[in-house]
Amino acid sequence: AIKERMLERIAFTKPDVVFLNLHGAAVVEGFDDCEGDLLSSIKALVGEGTPIYAVLDLHANVSPLMVKNADLLLGYNTEPHVDIRKRESECVEIYHRQLEEGFVMKTAYAQPPLLLPAINTDTNGGAMTPFIAQAFEYEKQAGVINVSPFAGFYGSDKYNAGPSIICTVTTDVSDAQAICNDISNIFIDKKDSFFVHLDPLDKIISTIKSAPSKKYAVIDECDDPLGGGPADGTYILDKLIEGGINKIGVSTICDREITEMAFAAGEGAVIKGLLGGKTDNKHGRPLPITAVVTKLICKPIPMCEANGEEFADYGETYTDYGRIAVISTEQADIVVTENKVPTEMINIFRHLDIDSNKYSVLVLKGFGHSYKTNFSDKEYVYFTAESIGVNNPDVTKIGEFKKIRRPVYPLDMK
């Protein structure tokens, strides 16, 4: 339905150029390459004489079909993605340059046989840093319009899941292909830099108990809402409770049933039920709870911290949490949301008027490096937990891949 509406509007407006902001790793039932299909459908509609320019996420799974049907594809150069508007502006600038100068662009593409986790793709010291730096060096060469290395998204079971490189030039396409091949080889050489150590939960619990005066943050990357996780995973919280850990603050668990129960009962009431673990059996069990409803909230909450200059591109973007219930068990305060939402770019406790300093342990879903930015005013010992879920940084433990090209590291080789 989305595709049909887009095509109808494009046909109605008869544009001189089509600008798109696509993620690049979308998955739709019935289409292995839905964004390639979308671009090819738009190209068939507007014809070869109407250019198509698109901006893609750094974690796009770029396919040859996408490259074939777009005149220019630009990837974000940052993780966290703070250059969205900048890359969109560059797209328009390149179009105007092409109109004025009349150059013809040629694009090459390469994809190494890799599947890399997203957890360490930070471009400010993380594994993607040298790739972006190399791309900028190549862009200094005469005739090079753009070089975009993509980390890919490992949670999509599609043929072209994984890292790739696009290079667009005004010289011979062989120049672009040489650049793509070079960066592809660098991906292969540096592949292990993307994989991180995951802390076993029994060791995390032992560490917390051995130094109880410190504050800890346990990151649940395996249930990352921005990566397709259901955000109702309970595995880490379950283990911490079982291990006797107290003063836990949890951000967040999505559970519409518990939220409805809390709002029906009201603040101060005691509720009993099963929390989380209801979307599937991949992120932990539904937890039996007896809890006091301590807060009920219905208000807009920003996607990013208002004072976070690095997230200025997101502007006044608000996330639809739906209704929010904060419930308290003997061992944990849990932020329960009606809708699945990301919280890695904000301190959700502050927005709910909760002092997170009162917690000894925070359990946070999403990227650890983003949380470190938003909790930088506090001294935490950070752990990325060895947990379970569809965003497991150990890509061999995500599940069965049926569509991805083979062989691919690390699924098939060491």
What are these regions (language model features)?
Residues K3, F12-Q98, D220-L237, I241, ...:
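Active-site histidine-anchored catalytic micro-motif
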Residues I2-T13, K203-T207:
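Short, charged beta->alpha transition segments
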Residues E4, I188, E305-K414:
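Extended hydrophobic packing segments that form well-structured cores
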Residues K14-V17, S213-K214, Y359:
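Short acidic/histidine-rich motifs immediately flanking catalytic phosphotransfer sites
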Residues E88, V92, H96-F136:
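Conserved anion/nucleotide-ligand pocket segment
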Residues A1-E8, G162, I166, V173, ...:
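N-terminal glycine-rich anion-binding loop in soluble enzyme alpha/beta folds
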Residues I119-E330, V335, N339:
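Hard-cation-handling environments
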Residues N77-H81, L275-K278, S387-G389:
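Short, acidic/turn-prone active-site loops that include or flank metal/cofactor-
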